[in-house]
Regions:
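Catalytic cores of nucleotide-sugar-dependent glycosyltransferases that transfer UDP/GDP/TDP-activated
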Residues: 1-488
């Protein structure tokens, strides 16, 4: 099966979040299942050409693409995804992609991704490569299914091509003015109140993708159900409800070549499910780095997160004094809204022997926090999938999470499971989005930590689970087949 995997970020070239990890890992697993995959990505100026060995594609040469009535010149560069034979095609248009960041608030943000989508299709035409499925990701590629079914329907190359849209976060929808009709050359009869592309008087790229993709999925089962409700659907629950039979949830996988405490190149000490002694050595190393005195009887709670409202830091702030009165130590890594950054800076200044904070992002430190922490906190308001709780399971850092999205699909509350006679709990969770519920779950974890035999059982329950990409890729293959059946 031939798959065109279209994404606006991909490890190791360009990354702002989890989408880059998906794009860098899933295609390789699909190849192992017999798929022929090509990846399509914008060539941002932030991508180092010489470092990655990008080569200009003379086979494709210059492509003139009309956006907003203006012809833009597009070129393509190619590369092989590291450790694979997968071709990566970089859409090069300096006018749109040579910016200071991957996503911008510039007034032509819509044009950037209209051009990207059209250029992907025209690259496929130049290659004369007819994919069975075009796999789109998030709003930036949301117009692709419409383009294939309408704007480019004259080309028999795409007669049997199906489309799949993966929603990584419904909160980001690509909502622009109706001038997009002209800019993208979309038929005017598609734009009307409540129509397939209209949202709040404008045009939503995400809604267009939901309306025209053959199959839709999101990145966990629970999130797929949640986005059908007003609480989580962000205004798109009605159109999602119409497509409910075509909506699926597939949990993201993780790359255990990178995230494994037995082999992790970022750790000073390695350890395994059979010998956890190295975990405390990492904890000691981490705490010493922040000038905090290690104590094996005091739990260390780690946080690695964007410091934004979605991640639950408002309810964290509500109970700050109660949390700091618990007999626990804290290491926090992240950046985001000023008020939350300031909150954690202030904490580490006021409680230097208890709280360590690093504002920014540090990849090595993120690995060390997973390895050194006894617990890992994710009190998210909503979480489409979440990866850090899965890393935490592997590293024996017991997750404390709000029961939402992918967190609900991966974390089983120890006390809840115990109540029903099961011994497979791997963390602690809470339902109610409140400071009180958050506090009680952390308090429970801190109390259970005193019982070393029980704690080790919770750790090993998590460490033995398998969330590798292999299982996820098999499920995507099933969805590709479903999409093709629908297209026929």
């Amino acid at each position: 099966m031939k798959i065109a995997f279209v994404s606006t970020e991909c490890v190791p070239y360009a990354k702002t979040g989890g989408l880059a990890d998906v794009a860098g890992s899933l295609p390789s697993e699909l190849v192992k299942l017999g798929c022929d995959v090509k990846i399509f990505l914008p060539k941002y100026s932030l991508i180092d050409e010489s470092q990655h060995g990008l080569k200009y594609s003379w086979d494709i040469s210059e492509m003139p693409i009309r956006i907003n009535g203006v012809i833009r010149s597009v070129h393509v560069h190619v590369n092989k995804l590291p450790h694979s034979n997968i071709g990566v095609y970089f859409i090069d248009c300096p006018h749109y992609f040579y910016r200071h960041r991957i996503y911008t608030n510039d007034p032509d943000e819509d044009e950037r991704f209209i051009l990207f989508s059209k250029a992907v299709i025209e690259t496929l035409q130049r290659l004369q490569w007819a994919p069975d499925v075009v796999h789109c990701n998030d709003w930036q590629t949301g117009l692709l299914p419409l383009f294939i079914k309408d704007n480019y329907s004259w080309d028999k190359l795409f007669d049997n091509t199906a489309t799949l849209l993966t929603i990584h976060n419904i909160g980001y929808q690509g909502l622009f003015s109706k001038s997009v009709l002209f800019g993208a050359e979309i038929q005017k009869n598609l734009f009307y109140p409540g129509g397939p592309i209209e949202q709040d008087g404008g045009i939503s790229f995400m809604k267009s993708g939901i309306s025209f993709a053959d199959i839709i999925n999101t990145v966990s089962n629970t999130y797929a159900h949640e986005i059908l409700t007003p609480e989580y659907g962000a205004g798109l629950e009605a159109v999602l409800k119409q497509r409910e039979d075509d909506l699926f949830g597939i949990l993201n996988g993780v790359d255990y070549n990178i995230w494994d405490p037995e082999t992790d190149k970022h750790l000073p000490y390695h350890y395994s499910i059979n010998d956890l002694s190295g975990k405390y050595l990492n904890k000691r190393y981490l705490l010493n780095h922040f000038g905090i005195k290690p104590d094996e009887n005091i739990p260390l709670i780690g946080i690695v997160s964007r410091m934004v409202l979605q991640k639950g830091f408002d309810i964290f702030a509500d109970i700050l004094s109660d949390l700091m009165s618990l007999d626990a130590q804290w290491i926090i890594l992240g950046s985001g809204e000023d008020k939350f950054e300031d909150l954690f800076r202030r904490l580490s200044n006021q409680l230097p022997g208890k709280v360590g904070t690093y504002i920014g992002y540090n990849n090595e430190l993120s690995h060390l926090i997973e390895a050194g922490s006894d617990m890992f906190l994710m009190p998210s308001r909503y979480e489409p999938c979440g990866l850090n709780q899965i890393y935490s399971l592997k590293y024996g850092a017991v997750p404390i999470v709000r029961k939402t999205g992918g967190l609900a699909d991966t974390i089983k509350d120890w006390d809840e499971q115990n109540h029903f006679g099961f011994k497979d709990g791997n963390g602690f969770s809470f339902y109610d989005y409140s400071g009180f519920a958050l506090y009680k779950s952390i308090e429970r974890a801190v109390n259970v930590f005193k019982h070393k035999d029980i704690w080790k059982k919770i750790q090993t329950n998590g460490m033995k689970l398998d969330f590798s990409w292999t299982r996820s890729a098999e499920k995507y293959l099933e969805l590709y087949k479903l999409a093709l059946e629908k297209r026929q």
